[in-house]
A protein has these predicted regions:
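Buried hydrophobic packing segments
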Residues: 66, 70, 97-101, 259-269, ...
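Short, surface-exposed amphipathic charged segments that create phosphate/polyanion-binding patches used
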Residues: 101, 147-148, 197-208, 387-395
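Short, acidic/turn-prone active-site loops that include or flank metal/cofactor-
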Residues: 89-92, 135-139, 190-194, 330-332, ...
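Phosphate-binding loop of NTP-binding sites
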Residues: 2-187
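Residue-level signal for inorganic ion chemistry
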Residues: 134, 167, 204, 258, ...
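Short hydrophobic/aromatic-enriched beta-strand-loop microsegments
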Residues: 110, 130-136, 184-191, 325-327, ...
Length: 416
């Protein structure tokens, strides 16, 4: 009874939010529903085969790829509704998850993005069939706290779900530690471009030694497991000699790793590997990320990065033939107000490309670029920064609120 009341209240709140022009209303609907019935997430998850996706970077992309791959199992129902419940907007905390499940109540499958800190209690509520563990590294310094504490919390949370299949990235030391003792693990070599936060063993505190792609702890029986899935430049290798083509619309080595884990998750639920890989390859844009827009006659591609590991990966995606690169950094609360992480990022030299430091913290960024030996100019407003670049292709790399605000300005026509 309380659950039905919560759902009706959520529907009314969402409608009112849309009417008032305050977005799609899903978050406010989820918040109100949980206030009325805190057990609603558990109720909505019953009867669904659910995949949870978590990690510091790549959650939204991998969730979108997983949803596409799971769609090959069920298609749509007679009313044309998706067979997979998932978030469209990356809202990965309780209210957003409830909103996604509410919007797809009849779906037999779910691909749910979950914030790392929320994974244990979300798993307790939804009893997932599969959990995808992507990577674990420092996020904003003033948000997530000590990374080894997070690893221990996730390890304890997963121990409560021995029947769940963990799709774990064996190239990430901290993720491996989370899954190492679990009885049902599928290991994927998805890559790890960031090892700064895993130089010591999370179990013994002793050093981690790297020998090529293999790693091991000097102080405990803890080493890189042998992967069942491995991603290549254009192929995906799986169990029993399986090798299938992997052609992605999204750029970068990290996205190939994301696709590998998404495919492995879908296969764990019975999907055909080749069909799952083809479906994952159709994902092109996630909440504005990777999209290309025209701004003042310049073809502008939008990239988002939120922490040192994400910045390092995004910088590797920059097209060296671009005529301009705008790097926009804000320092608002959602970004993390401590920008000392800028000094952990290895900024490249972009010969022949005009680099522009932008955003509310453009001056801090400019200092870092100067010490990195990157020639640049400073134009605080991101739209003006794009306009300052020579005509042609411009790459924009921005942190969370800078990316959000620039997208909003583009949607309102400020850059037309």
């Amino acid at each position: 009874m309380r659950g039905q009341l919560a759902l009706r209240a959520a529907t009314v709140a969402s409608w009112a939010s849309r009417r008032a022009g305050r977005g799609n209303g899903s978050m406010i609907g989820g918040l109100i529903a949980l206030k009325i019935d805190p057990s609603l997430m558990t109720q909505l998850g019953r009867g669904k085969r659910t995949v949870l996706v978590t990690g510091t970077n790549g959650k939204s992309t991998t969730t979108r790829m997983t949803a596409a791959a799971l769609q090959t199992l069920g298609g749509a129902d007679r009313r044309g509704l998706s067979s997979v419940a998932t978030q469209a907007d990356g809202a990965n905390m309780d209210a957003g998850i409830v909103a996604a499940l509410t919007a797809h109540r009849s779906a037999p499958l779910a691909a749910i993005e979950v914030d790392e800190l929320h994974l244990p209690h979300v798993a307790d509520a939804l009893n997932p069939s599969v959990v995808v563990l992507l990577n674990l590294s420092r996020d904003q310094l003033d948000r997530v706290g000590e990374i080894n504490m997070i690893e221990r919390r996730l390890r304890e949370g997963m121990a409560r779900h021995p029947a769940a299949v963990l799709i774990a990235n064996c190239d990430d030391v901290l993720v491996t530690s989370i899954a190492y003792d679990h009885p049902n693990v599928v290991w994927v070599s998805a890559g790890s471009g960031w090892s700064v936060d895993a130089t010591s063993c999370p179990r013994s505190g002793e050093p981690i030694v790297w020998e090529g792609e293999h790693w091991y702890s000097t102080g405990a029986d803890f080493q890189r497991p042998v992967p069942q899935w491995r991603v290549g430049e254009h192929t995906l290798s799986g169990p029993d000699g399986l090798e299938i083509p992997l052609a992605l619309a999204l750029p970068g080595r990290a996205n190939r790793g994301n696709a590998a884990q998404a495919v492995a998750a879908a296969v764990a639920l019975g999907a055909d590997p080749a069909a799952a890989a083809a479906a994952a390859g159709t994902v092109r844009e996630i909440a504005g990320r990777y999209r290309t827009v025209e701004v003042d006659g310049r073809r502008t591609r939008m990239l988002l990065a939120k922490n040192p590991a994400g910045w390092q990966e995004a910088l590797s995606m920059i097209d060296p033939a671009a005529t301009g690169l705008v790097i926009a950094v804000n320092g608002q609360v959602p970004d993390g107000e401590d920008l000392s992480w800028l000094w952990d990022v290895r900024f490249e030299h972009f010969e022949g490309t005009q680099v522009v430091a932008a955003g509310e913290r453009a001056t801090d960024l400019a200092v870092r670029l100067t010490y990195a030996g990157v020639e640049h100019i400073t134009v605080a407003d991101p739209l003006d920064a794009i306009a300052s670049c020579p005509p042609g292709r411009v790459e924009v790399l921005a942190n969370y609120t800078a990316f959000r605000d620039l997208n909003r300005d583009l949607e309102t026509g400020a850059g037309a």
